[in-house]
Amino acid sequence: MISIYICEDQHHQLEQISQVIENHILIENLDMSIALKAKSPVELLNEIEGNKTSNIYFLDVDLQSSMNGIELAEAIRKNDPRGFIIFVTTHSEMSHLTFKYKVEALDFIIKGDLATMKKQIISCLDNITQKLALASPELQKRFNLRTKDKTVNVAYDDIYFFE
């Protein structure tokens, strides 16, 4: 299971982002879950310290803290070099800093219109799911069957015939 960490200092925004993520996980039956909804960078860093798995991070840039979201991403990279970092912020002018700090962000989502933000968050989660499937040899050797309410993955070795 892939863990998702959200760091957003505004409670309303934190709940909006987490609701979009939780709904998409349920609808698509993804092997992901929100591990932490943090309001401070220190809380998130303490949680992931020593964790050696790749995770997903949704980070605000302006965290009203001594550390901004881009500096937080830089600290995350030291612990999780393969993690997926997505910035969700109102500060579009700071997008160039992701290159300066070399954090390799997957996306830079601008807050504002909830419908647009929702589409971009879902697009990020789908993109991550595809990347993980391509990176995992055992997932490549699986048959994916999508029904109305869920997706089932079956190893090709376990399939004898289709009826």
Label the predicted regions.
Residues L30, K52, V103, V154-D157:
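Structured loop/turn residues at beta-strand edges in well-structured enzyme cores
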Residues H11-S18, S95:
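Charged phosphotransfer/docking patches of two-component systems
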Residues Q120-E163:
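Conserved binding/recognition cores within well-folded domains
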Residues I25-D31, D80:
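Short helix-capping segments at alpha-helix termini
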Residues E15-Q19, S33-I56:
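Acidic, metal-coordinating helix/loop segments flanking the phosphotransfer/catalytic sites
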Residues E8:
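Conserved acidic carboxylate
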Residues S54-A133:
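CheY-like receiver
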Residues M1-Y5:
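Non-catalytic signal-transmission and effector/linker regions of two-component phosphorelay proteins
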